[in-house]
Amino acid sequence: MTISSTSALTLDIIRNRLKLSADFTYRAGRHVRDKMENKYTYWSGTDVSGTDKASSSLENKTYKTDYISTSVVGTLTPGLGRHNRLSIMAGWNLEDYVQKTAKTYRQGNLYPSKPSFTLMDGDYYSTESGGKSWGLVGFFTRVDYALKDRYMAEFSARYDGSSKFPTRSKWGFFPSVSAGWRISDEPWIRSCSGQCLSNLKLRVSVGSLGNANIDPYQYLETMRATGSSSVANTTIVLNGMRVPYTSVPNLVPDNMTWEKVTTYNIGMDLSMFAHKFSFTADLYRRRTTDLYTVGPDLPHVLGSSAPSGNYASLKTSGWELSADWHDSMRLSGKRFSYSVKAMLWDSRSYVTSYYNATGDLTTYYKGMEIGEIWGFKTDGIYASNAEAEAGPSYSFFKNGEMFRAYAGDLKFVDLDGDGKMSVGNRTLSDHGDLTIIGNQSPRLQYSFGISLNWNGIGLSMLWQGVGKRDWYPWTESGFFWGKWNRAYNALMKSQTGDNRVKVDKSSDNWIVTNMDKRPYWTRMVSLAANRNNGPLTWENDHYLQDASYIRLKNLTLDYTFPLAMCRRIGLSGLKLYFTGENLFTWSPMFRHTDMFDPEVISSGDSDFENTLTPGLGKTGNGYSYPMLKTYTFGINLTF
């Protein structure tokens, strides 16, 4: 259960000149989870057998959270004459978060129908408690100035302190500055643009923000007593008695501070034809420094892993475009209005610093593009055993019979020309036949909408999508691999008929008999996509999926009855409507599988997905709860 309450107060101290506002938010969470397990005995027979569960248990967990947020803001707008506009804002904010957890566990339910710790006889029990807290306080200001609403400048800054950092680096200063020029108000452009140019504004800005989104206590050496919660939950015995103990704490980083994101932006706002057409363009570059990540390697003799700290940096370049057109006309004597709006944006991010001396490809490295996928190149499918024997050695793929290639197997490309498939040491300097085959980051994202209205009939729709994105199904994507994952899995509908190779094994030289049908699925080998070092567990461009998509996010059709008709039945308004969401989706990957939702394929459900490292192209198994189709019919009555 979560309860939230917000209060706000605004004082207009000097009318239209000085205003003071304050707000206070309190959010409380109280959650309890009980888990009971009872004894059971498997039926033992010729078909089914199993291991009995000889013990019963009861577990109780409680979670208590309290969050407070408050701020005070003052705004001064002095009168500086007709052509000058100045606004000064200053404020203070505070956040405080406290979480407490408790867990009680015991074995031995005497009465399973009445679970209670007082009705248990087990010797094994444990009690645990924990929690965390953090606080943040900040001071901020913003100064806006405009001359003739033609030349604009703004300065803003934040000075924030967080309890998550040590005293020497607790505070961070994050300034921003921007300027704008409304060219359309210049007399010299008005004289030449006529009535077609409504607004033209150029913008430039540079600003920084801080990020403290890490767990608290990372800069402290923390220890806990192991075994103190239960007399049976310790392996240390002194004087014939079990006693609690603790361990040497992990190392703490030598640098711990705010992550800093600095963005440089230039943009343009354009309106034409009495504001019927508008266009906005932005070009930006973002630098993220002091990223919280793993630190430099330490000698193995030290006996401790490297602590995480502010050791990495990232750069992102991108652009955003949006256009809008709206107008109206007479159609069959009735007013017809319409509007069309479209947006397109893209960005790419690269690692500019990261501790990875060996260039290990299983983690981040300097120069890496976020989301890149390393894998094997392929050149179709082997048509015969003879062709497979002439290809590179497949001894690298140790998966049962897959010590060599056969007819119907993928034809991997030996990029380094050494006569065998390999991954080398999986480093930048020695990566064998691996190469970059794709990228899982969404690119060329877009949306566009249409709105029409005529004679009380309204129609609107919103489409959205991603123009470029790759996804490789990981080992446990059973809904993609089917029997190539495990023999007892279902055969997917895309793996039937001529979409799968058919192999004639009547001679030693096996031959694929349906190569003319261009089958997508190779010879079926159970666990080829699951077992360690199976040939399909390694990313390859044959099974790399194009996860771009287009989706109809919203469709609304409505009819508003004429006002005269409404008045005759005692109403001031009557409207019928239908709204549908996620009604249509198309993706190139649907040619091979329609078991996944491309919009959420990389987010994943923690109950199913084995997510590895998202930035490294390992997006897990794609088991995400899909975006549901919804249909809504409604009526609006106004009295």
Show where each model-derived region lies.
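Intrinsically disordered, compositionally biased low-complexity regions
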Residues: 44-45
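Conserved small-residue
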Residues: 218, 225-230, 328-440, 471, ...
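Extracytoplasmic gating/loop element in the C-terminal half of outer-membrane beta-barrel translocons
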Residues: 162, 466-570, 574-575, 593
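Conserved SET/PR-domain catalytic core that frames the SAM/AdoMet-binding pocket
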Residues: 341, 431-432, 442-456, 553-558, ...
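Extracellular/periplasmic, surface-exposed regions of secreted and cell-surface proteins
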Residues: 1-37, 48-377, 535, 539-639
